[in-house]
Amino acid sequence: MSNSYMPIDYVLNFSTFTLHAWNGLSLFLIISGTWFISGMCTKAKGDRLLLCWWALTGLIHIIQEGYFVFTPDLFKDKSPNFIAELWIEYNKGDSRYVSRHTSVLAIEGMAAVVMGPLSLLVVYAIVKAKSYSYILQFGVSIAQLYGACLYFLTAFLEGDNFASSPYYYYAYYVGQSSIWIIVPSLIAINFWRKMNGICQLHDKKKAKVC
């Protein structure tokens, strides 16, 4: 796979292992911290898992993706910070980022500005047992699915030739991005089943009254 946008001569300040280790540690702390705090709220296991997901995805959208969107000179900085180097590393799997391709810029922009805050609103809604938490989860999950599908589809329509090697293509582009198809799909399906059950129960009660 050719990679016309990849700055091949760029040297990272952090090694790939160090980047993944620190990034993995930060994600682990978010998940474990959310799990621990949610346990103090006497939430069911399913709700606690959802809280972990929504806290994690919300912070990723706002911090990591927001940094990419609002830092136009990210790939020109000669002394990039940790988040910038994460994007430089991820660019090995999808070089559209270094060129600030309009498709990824639009998708990441919506994720940072809209889906990130809404994901954190879901956290609040679950903790406070708000009635709108389910419909909000469904809506944000569908939006994430839509964004992920656009992300893959736009790459496919342009030749799907943006990775520096097959390894980075499957590990970064496919592997990491697929999370926003798998998890939102599971949440949306679960909500759909619950809504069907509620509607069926309502129809049965209505039939008895008639």
From Swiss-Prot:
Q: Which residues cross the membrane?
A: 17-37, 50-70, 107-127, 135-155, 172-192
GO BP: sterol biosynthetic process
Q: Gene encoding it?
A: ISM1
Q: What class of enzyme is it?
A: isomerase
Q: What does the record say about its membrane topology?
A: Multi-pass membrane protein
Keywords (alphabetical) are: Isomerase, Lipid biosynthesis, Lipid metabolism, Membrane, Steroid biosynthesis, Steroid metabolism, Sterol biosynthesis, Sterol metabolism, Transmembrane, Transmembrane helix
Q: Cite the Pfam families for this sequence.
A: EBP (PF05241)
Q: What is this protein called?
A: Isomeliandiol synthase ISM1
Family note: Belongs to the EBP family.
Q: Name one GO molecular function term.
A: cholestenol delta-isomerase activity
Q: In which pathway does it act?
A: Secondary metabolite biosynthesis; terpenoid biosynthesis
Cellular localisation: Membrane
What is the protein's species of origin?
Ailanthus altissima (Tree-of-heaven)
Give every EXPERA domain span.
46-188
> Which E.C. number(s) belong to this protein?
5.3.3.-
